Amino acid sequence: MKSAFLFLFIMFSGITLSQNLKFTIKNQKDTTVHLIKYFGTKKFYADTGELKNGVVQFDGSKQANGILGLLMPGQKYFEFIYNNEDIEFTTEGPDYLGNLTIQKSDENNVFIPYIKFIGSQKSKMGQLGKQRASLDAESDEYKALTTQINEINEGVVAYQKNIINNHAEKLVSKIVKMSTEVLIPEAPVDANGDIIDSNFRFTYYRKHFWDNVDLTNDALVNNPIFHNKLEYFFGQNMMIQHWDTVTKFAFEFCDGLNPTSKMFEYSVGWITSSFGKSKIMGMDKVYLEMLNRYYCTNNLEGESPAFWVGEDKFEDLCDNLKNKLRLTIGSKPFNLYLKDTSDQVWVDFYSLNSDYTILYFWDPECGHCKKTTPKLETLYKEKFKARNIEIFSVGKAIGDDFGKWKKFIRENKLTFINAAITDRLYTDAKETPEKFVPLYPGEPNKPTTLESLNYQNTYDIFSTPKVFLLDKDKKIIAKSISISQLEEMLDRLQGFEDLPKLFPPDPEEDAQMQKKE
């Protein structure tokens, strides 16, 4: 008898019991309905089912824990928590949430009343806020309404604390806790009662920002609250929007996550994508540093940490990454050793003893270049040259472009440095590269470098014109700026901000010279 019981225990212990999600929708015609899921703030179809005789069911074992929703015809839907349990609801439209009753689900016996309560309190506060908006802040009526609003808010906080304290083992508790703010203690004071650190509250808040979020629980990613907190933490309210600052906090945060988790996937993916789209000059460094650390550098297992990215995507993400990192603000780019218009003299920009150096890449056949290059010459003659600002321009001069390049320089009387891979240099270097570039580290007496001969790749030049502004140490301080922005910036940097501007902002030119590849 004992052996038979043991056999049955072993047999049934190997069976995975799937969770059933059952919904009864009263007075609803047979139709197709969808289960929806979150990944951050984005909604996706999780499953599709057929509502027949008012009932539809889904296999819960196919779903990740978190917030799910049932999408009805007419884009009506209601949300609920799924956490590896059977669920059975009954409801009726059009107010599916308001009419919802729960036959089975421990999580939602807590969650559904909570969101109904939050909805009602939010409505009350909205009405009181509208009444208060038209009143004098010193009036008794204004103060009375403020008291009512505060009382409602206190009631919400008390409700949340009750869930957090009495249902700690449930996912609903973790979701509610994630939505609450960290409590900040009073700032320390000295013997005289004066605050020791005026930044204490801000520093404490940032340091403890994630205290109410269980970063080990992937279910919290399947919820817009986590995304909103991530977005706020890396925004201007929590840190200076400087590439080095953001990168530092991004590394600290992501390195502290389980590298095989959805929490890691979402956080790394969002930070990388978000700062890759940033319009703030210099923030591309965050994007590139994130790529370098989490996508393009293998871990100890010899694999990319970005386990969610398909193999076919890595080439695009990681192509030319090392060069791109040398083109970020604060970095010193590769020197360029090229020929001048005589096709005899080698020139480079590291040797320029200038306070600022403008690297300017252009093409004599480029329509925008035909407008911007003469403007740059005007600035050089009338402002920059006398202020020890040099321009090192690199033009396209291979094949027929060599003659066009020289003709444009001559006709527009360009007096700044004009360099290029000339047609002869291109041909000779292609036939006998050993005469021009080092074949091994430390090899002496070679006039140029592989980076110079491949300058388009080195400087990521796939459209022209393109500008880099370097300081006296030849470090990049600005890039992809227009002629008017260049003039304004250099006037300001050298204390001439009150000088009349030769070139006012040109929206078309600005857009062309600022666009990302």
Question: Where are each of the predicted segments found?
Answer:
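Bacterial Sec-dependent N-terminal signal peptides
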Residues: 1-24, 479, 497, 516-517
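Thiol/disulfide oxidoreductase modules built on the thioredoxin-like
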Residues: 428-492
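Structural microenvironment flanking redox-active thiols in thiol-disulfide oxidoreductases
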Residues: 371-412, 420-433, 451-454
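Structural micro-motif
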Residues: 65, 176, 414-417, 459-468
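N-terminal "domain-start" segment that seeds a small globular fold
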Residues: 307-349, 441-445, 488-491, 495-496, ...
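Short active-site neighborhood of thiol/selenol oxidoreductases, capturing the structured segment around
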Residues: 346-376, 390-392
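A non-transmembrane, solvent-exposed segment enriched in polar/low-complexity residues
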Residues: 19-168, 175-179, 183-212, 216
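A short beta-strand-turn-helix
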Residues: 337-357, 381, 456
